[in-house]
């Protein structure tokens, strides 16, 4: 385990992951005929979803978790490439939809955009939080 990481449960991140999972499921089913919008946006959101799942259970800095989520996307893409190279076929239709079946550089771009979206979103979230202020003196100012 990377130094500074601890197991924990973050309910807000878990709720975000569940909500995003529902959105991804709707995108995969209802939006099945939306072509590249469904597939590209789905890949962008998939990295964000993996990040939220990691964040829900692992307390760590943003960058390592975001890189891990991006890495999961790259591993899926590598798996697709190797499956095509070795002419392997995933028999389960649902798993084939989730994992995809064709390696594509556009998918890697979508994963990179998802990674950047995670970093930007976390930066905006942290910027909106109140800063810890220095303790005030109990001595009255004259």
Model-flagged regions — what are they?
Residues 1-130, 140-142:
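Bulky hydrophobic segments
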Residues 134-136:
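Compositionally biased, low-complexity intrinsically disordered regions
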